[in-house]
């Protein structure tokens, strides 16, 4: 990973009824004149983050892990009767967590 990139936990609800959890390499933002960029060394996963990460509808008995290293993806099935409630996030890879501790 270069100094221009960072890592993000992502959660994606696919149209075929799966939640996919992955770690994405993303480009670090370039701060404006009145902004700073901090290095995050630790970040918790709070209960509110788990709602986005796993969703209330995930069937944890269907967990599947594929790939390796930075290409690892964890997936699980979603209860089909609850898919309608989650339509707004279909096929969108969303970052999880917004708190952290940095230097």
Predicted regions: what they are:
Residues 15-17:
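Proline/serine/threonine-rich low-complexity linkers at boundaries of modular beta-sandwich domains
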Residues 29-43, 58-103:
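Glycine-rich beta-strand-centered segment in the early N-terminal region that forms part
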Residues 2-9:
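Short structural boundary motif marking the start of a folded domain
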Residues 4, 22-24, 100:
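Short beta-strand or tight-loop elements
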Residues 20-23, 88:
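Residues that act as N-cap/strand-start positions at coil-to-secondary-structure junctions
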Residues 10-13, 54:
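Residue-level signal for short segments within beta-strands and strand-turn junctions
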Residues 48-53:
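Cytochrome P450 core scaffold surrounding the K-helix E-X-X-R motif
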